[in-house]
A protein has these predicted regions:
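Generic marker of residues within folded, mature protein domains
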Residues: 6, 57, 69-71
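C-terminal edge-of-domain segments
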Residues: 64-85
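An N-terminal amphipathic alpha-helical segment
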Residues: 1-38
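A generic structural signal for beta-strand entry/edge sites
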Residues: 13, 44, 74-76
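Amphipathic, hydrophobic secondary-structure cores in small proteins
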Residues: 30-35, 39-66
Length: 85
């Protein structure tokens, strides 16, 4: 799958490395929802996880956000959410 046109590194406003939270048993969904709600049109929120966060992607897509996830060269998954309206 090709990277969508809206995923531009210069538009990433926030990057959250969720690995420390997940290691503590904390699910970052609420934080992601709060951060994404504050995004301006075109801004991107990136979350880094050791697995594809499928339920989170589904919830954010259902809330009207554009979503895209890719496996990085570091073995981590980089998932992007944007309010592109």
């Amino acid at each position: 799958m090709n990277t969508p046109e809206w995923v531009k590194k210069e538009n990433i406003k926030i990057t959250l490395d969720a690995r420390p939270l997940l290691a503590q048993g904390i699910h970052p969904l609420e934080q992601v929802q709060q951060e994404c709600a504050a995004l301006q049109p075109g801004e991107i929120f990136e979350i880094i996880t050791p697995f594809p966060p499928a339920p989170m992607i589904e919830k954010m897509a259902a809330a009207g956000f554009e979503t895209y996830s890719e496996s990085g060269g570091d073995g981590m998954f980089h998932t992007f959410f944007s309010n592109i309206q």
